[in-house]
Swiss-Prot record:
ATP binds at residue 259. Catalyzes the attachment of glutamate to tRNA(Glu) in a two-step reaction: glutamate is first activated by ATP to form Glu-AMP and then transferred to the acceptor end of tRNA(Glu). SUPFAM superfamilies: An anticodon-binding domain of class I aminoacyl-tRNA synthetases, Nucleotidylyl transferase. PANTHER family: GLUTAMATE--TRNA LIGASE, GLUTAMATE--TRNA LIGASE, MITOCHONDRIAL-RELATED. This is Glutamate--tRNA ligase. GO terms for cellular component: cytosol. Keywords: Aminoacyl-tRNA synthetase, ATP-binding, Cytoplasm, Ligase, Nucleotide-binding, Protein biosynthesis. Belongs to the class-I aminoacyl-tRNA synthetase family. Glutamate--tRNA ligase type 1 subfamily. Signal peptide: none annotated.
Length: 496
């Protein structure tokens, strides 16, 4: 396989909302393909008509595109092994089943679940042991008798009588002893192929060389290797792919992150204002690291460094605080003009309007780029620029406004009313002269009431720049209105 082009696949089922574990798997496959100069194949496993949905399929496409994980073959782009939706490949799967039956690699099984349990009980075994390989050696007469009863057989693969061992690229040598895995079903009674068949068959037909997937699928690997061995013997494929089982992603405590956990929902992170660079960087750290002292890296740097053999086999815990911190770093790394574009797009998607022209919006964006963790934080800092969204927080008012603030507000109003140029340096100079020098106040005492009056909060972008953006009229109106704040009640409107 060393001279063969690396081909990996990402094959989600279109059910529910894309979750971070699924996307981590996609990322590791994508990065390995790009690192090796190979192909990233995207295949949809839509074999469960009762659970699959077009909405979920479109959500997966949306997720991959938003993150920039492009695929070389698959839905929307095509490729040499079309179709890439398993529901459209049934005839290919049935043909492999036919060949397996003809070669004696598989057989028809008529036993019901109740009959299997009864045989286990009669032999003093646990009735929940699973299939007992009873139908392996049925005679043609016995099969005919079952058909005469109206029974529809499933097709089962004959498991080998030897140990199944593979060198897992993450976990090392892994062995399942002979006899541990019973003969397993490849089809339903109506002949429809099952996931246990279609997944490895499609991997074989699409010449997948490496299977990178979650460790929850490790128990199915001996079955798949046995099926591969059978497919080699009947000429469907000529090799078995390398397997790498990625570590579980844990949530709180030692519990595996569930699809029901909010932090597992990819789109909730996007809605909060994660940017692709930040989220991908964090997901990469769930089982892999680029260096012991280097947690912040780009996707290009990951591609250069990524080798699946470096993935850690220990479970990885999803730490929201660390994810947030990494996202904040990537927001800071954006070029200013790129940050403006991202923030404007985010605000538009969430119905946030500041009422600023392009140049003023760029100034506002610059004020918050180093002060936010996710894009959503920017609205909380900048919404004071929208008169409809502006409101004085009662807690902030109780802390900073009231009778003691009146001299400060009056001095500020007097200093600002006489300004000829409404610029940040002029505003800063006038206020420092009036409050720091004139009233001999410390900066916090001088500017705390002004910040709450102008922005409605104790935490805001830089005060003087905020006043310039707000404009002289609205700034002075808010300062005047703040004088009337008594006992948590005051005029918060901008109409004088």
């Amino acid at each position: 396989m060393s001279n063969t082009k690396i081909r990996v696949r990402f094959c989600p089922s279109p059910t529910g909302t894309p979750h971070v574990g699924l996307i981590r798997t996609a990322l590791f496959n994508w990065a390995y393909a790009r690192h090796c100069g190979g192909d990233f194949v995207f295949r949809i496993e839509d074999t469960d008509a009762g659970r699959d949905s077009e909405e979920s399929y479109l959500a997966i496409l949306d997720a991959l595109r938003w993150l920039g994980l492009d695929w070389d073959e698959g839905p929307e782009v095509g490729g040499p092994y079309e179709p890439y939706r398993q529901s459209q490949r049934k005839e290919l799967h049935r043909e492999v089943v036919r060949k397996l039956l003809e070669a004696g690699e598989a057989y028809e099984a008529f036993s019901t679940a109740e009959e299997v349990e009864a045989r286990h009980l009669a032999a003093g075994r646990n009735p929940k042991l699973g299939y007992d390989n009873y139908d392996r050696d049925l005679t043609e007469e016995q099969r005919a008798a079952f058909r005469a009863e109206g029974r529809d057989p499933v097709v089962r693969l004959r498991m080998p009588d030897h140990d199944i061992t593979w060198n897992d690229l993450v976990r090392g040598e892994t062995t399942f002893a002979a006899g541990v895995v019973p003969d397993f079903a490849l089809t339903r009674g109506n002949g429809d192929p099952l996931y246990t068949l279609v997944n490895p068959v499609d991997d074989a037909l699409m010449k997948i060389t490496h299977v990178l997937r979650g460790e929850d699928l490790l128990p199915s690997t001996p079955r798949q290797i046995a099926l591969y061995e059978a497919m080699i013997r009947i000429g469907v494929t000529d090799s078995i792919p390398a397997f790498a089982h990625l570590p579980s992603v844990l949530g709180e405590g030692t519990k595996k992150l569930s699809k029901r956990d909010p932090q597992s929902n990819l789109f909730l992170h996007r809605d909060r204002g994660f940017i692709p660079e930040g989220l991908l960087n964090y997901l990469a750290l769930l089982g892999w690291s680029i260096a012991d002292d280097h947690d912040i890296f780009s996707l290009a740097e990951m591609v250069t460094a990524f080798d699946v053999t470096d993935v850690n086999s220990n479970p990885a815990r999803f730490d929201q605080k660390k994810a947030d911190a990494i996202n904040a770093e990537h927001i800071r790394l954006l070029a200013p003009e790129e940050f403006v574009t991202r923030l404007r797009t985010y605000f538009a998607a969430h119905g946030h309007e500041l009422g600023l022209d392009e140049s003023a919006f760029a100034v506002a964006a610059d004020l918050v780029q180093t002060r936010i963790v996710v894009l959503g934080d920017a609205w909380g800092l900048l919404k004071f620029l929208n008169d409809d969204a502006y409101a004085i927080d009662p807690g902030a008012a109780r802390k900073e406004l009231g009778e003691a603030s009146l001299p400060v507000l009056d001095a500020a109003i007097g200093a600002l009313e006489s300004l000829e140029a409404w610029t940040t340096p002029a505003i800063e100079g006038a206020l420092k002269s009036a409050l720091i020098e004139g009233l001999e106040l410390k900066p916090r005492k001088a500017f705390g009431p002004l910040r709450v009056a102008v922005t409605g909060a104790t935490v805001s972008p830089p005060l003087f720049e905020s006043m310039e953006l707000l404009g002289s009229g609205r700034t002075l109106t808010r300062l005047r209105n703040a004088r009337s704040w008594e006992n948590g009640v005051g005029d918060q409107t901008d109409s004088g």
